């Protein structure tokens, strides 16, 4: 039960990191042009 919960948390964190690292390049490409 505990290992299953740990595995689920790992998968969730993995997807969160994937979403952040996948969204950051797009945001960085748009942000500098707007700020400058």
Swiss-Prot record:
This protein's record includes keyword Membrane: yes
SUPFAM superfamilies per the UniProt record, alphabetical: Photosystem II reaction center protein I, PsbI
Keyword Transmembrane appears in the UniProt entry: yes
A Pfam family that the UniProt record links to this protein: PsbI
Compartmental location: Plastid membrane
Main localisation: plastid
InterPro entries according to UniProt: PSII_PsbI, PSII_PsbI_sf
Domain of life: Eukaryota
GO cellular component: photosystem II reaction center; plastid membrane; thylakoid membrane
Summary of subunit composition and partner proteins: PSII is composed of 1 copy each of membrane proteins PsbA, PsbB, PsbC, PsbD, PsbE, PsbF, PsbH, PsbI, PsbJ, PsbK, PsbL, PsbM, PsbT, PsbX, PsbY, PsbZ, Psb30/Ycf12, at least 3 peripheral proteins of the oxygen-evolving complex and a large number of cofactors. It forms dimeric complexes.
HAMAP family found in the cross-reference section: PSII_PsbI (MF_01316)
Record protein name field: Photosystem II reaction center protein I
Species annotation: Orobanche minor (Small broomrape)
């Amino acid at each position: 039960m505990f290992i299953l919960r740990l595995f689920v948390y790992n998968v969730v964190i993995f997807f969160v990191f994937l979403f952040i690292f996948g969204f950051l390049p797009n945001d960085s490409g748009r942000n500098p042009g707007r700020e400058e």
